């Protein structure tokens, strides 16, 4: 009977065959231990010399790391294993014998591992990170489908930038200029006027020359937009969404979290409502904490965000930033005209901002004024202005960065490990 490592627990005390790769092995004179993986999980195969023919035992001792094989044996309980079971091997069939595998069980430097990213993905920890990423994506679709959102796919090639920055990847679009999308937000606002609640999930590109552990050049974003929704209501959706994906990972990825040595007690504390602190109060807090490198009207850096998040030890919303440091489309704060109705969600443990969101300007004249203040080409935003001409409504939205969220939940130090093939400032290969 052919099965997988994950499904093998259904076949205790039965003989099965599994297609797998050998990740590692050790042997003595009478027994060989084979560490196996098949994409669904990792399992130990035990080859006892007295219970197999001489050829099979010799094969178990000689087989090379990452060779592919069909392995047949009986699934037995093993309380020492994370899975709770292992295989007592009866026979081994080589599918392909691997050459000298470059990533050995010893430690390797980061550059070496990134040069061999196509192989590094096979390791137990990298496998765990990708499984957690997959669960976050699955839970994302689940949450938005259950809450009445329609999935919309905005274009990746665009003629304008929603953030109003120059850090864009430029390309020729026949006889016109085009840019790789920084965000699908403006198109999602248009879709929200048709469908009410919408979300997108896709790649975004930012030509930022940043080399921090939080930045990628190409990354994936989840961008919901909601008609007839104010800023406070949007914050509630955001915290419900983040709580949902954290709980989903806790429910479905315990083996992966264990493989990463993740302290899950920190994740178990994540529950709504999240704490909120205004930008003004955050500045005051930082001053009291001894930060003298930040003044009102300046954006927070990583040390500032970390200090604020550590104070709460939970995801925390920083609300109502100064107008001058935020994009042109954000709705003014009626209680303070120098700030806008926005919030950044800061993840704990030093992972920084994972969500940026705001209520959007719904008044045509004000939006035109802001576009001019930011010295943007009004013609490029004519379709966006149309949304305020024909049935404009209060509406809000946000964007969640997938890779930073994966980094926080999985507990990995650098965001490069959360993308299967990360694009960094000096890395376009593999």
UniProtKB/Swiss-Prot annotation:
Source organism, top-level taxon: Bacteria
Subunit structure: Homodimer.
Parts of the chain that traverse the membrane: none
Name of the protein in its database record: Asparagine--tRNA ligase
Entry's localization field: Cytoplasm
Keyword terms of this UniProt record: Aminoacyl-tRNA synthetase, ATP-binding, Cytoplasm, Ligase, Nucleotide-binding, Protein biosynthesis
Membership in a protein family: Belongs to the class-II aminoacyl-tRNA synthetase family.
One Pfam family matching this protein: tRNA_anti-codon
InterPro entries xref list: Aa-tRNA-synt_II, aa-tRNA-synth_II, aa-tRNA-synth_II/BPL/LPL, Asn-tRNA-ligase, Asp/Asn-tRNA-synth_IIb, NA-bd_OB-fold, NA-bd_OB_tRNA
Keyword Nucleotide-binding: yes
Gene Ontology, cellular component aspect: cytoplasm
GO biological process: asparaginyl-tRNA aminoacylation
E.C. no: 6.1.1.22
NCBIfam families (UniProt xref): asnS, PRK03932.1, PRK05159.1
Catalytic activity: tRNA(Asn) + L-asparagine + ATP = L-asparaginyl-tRNA(Asn) + AMP + diphosphate + H(+)
Family annotation (SUPFAM superfamilies): Class II aaRS and biotin synthetases (SSF55681), Nucleic acid-binding proteins (SSF50249)
Enzyme class per UniProt: ligase
GO molecular function, one term: catalytic activity, acting on a protein
